[in-house]
Amino acid sequence: MERVVKKANPTLFDKAFGYIQDALATNLLWLNHVLPQAERLVKEINGRKVYTPNIYVGENEYEQILPDAQDIGNYSFFILEEPQEVHYEVGSRVKMSSPFSLIVWLDIRSVYNEDLRDMEMVKRDILRAIRRTWMRNGHFHIERIYQRAENIFKEFTMDEVDNQFLMQPYCGFRFRGEIEIEEECEL
């Protein structure tokens, strides 16, 4: 998998997420993979539904991106939450807004090359990186940060996200905020 995975020919929110991906990739060299918006897929295991985050990799294939999915290293991805609001008046640009989350998971040893658990320093570095985002025709802000597994991966089946993947040396965050875009398009 490439370090920065973007959707081909992105529009609307995917295009805006691409700007944030660029800032993350440029400013957080410890991120092995800077991924686009994830899709929530469902599979049945032992008669029960299990929900997982996945990214589309082409040719009708998806790659699961939970911490235990495979050895993908430190990574980030986006979740576009609902509802998406549309503001449109005839003769003007379309404005859309939506809550969103940036999920970041990492092995803290690869960030500082030490056996320390300074999660506040990691949060600071991530906030500094996304603050450097230049976004054409849009803006975003972060309102909340979550650290507990049940909040970071709340849309997904908790059994699949064992808490061991948030114990030393691993940690994760959910940066939740609001994103607004403007687009020239016909409705």
Describe every region a protein language model picked out.
Residues 34-50, 114-124, 176-187:
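Short N-terminal helix-initiation segments at or just after the protein's N-terminus
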Residues 92-110, 165-183:
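Oligomerization/assembly interface segments of phage tail-like spikes and tubes
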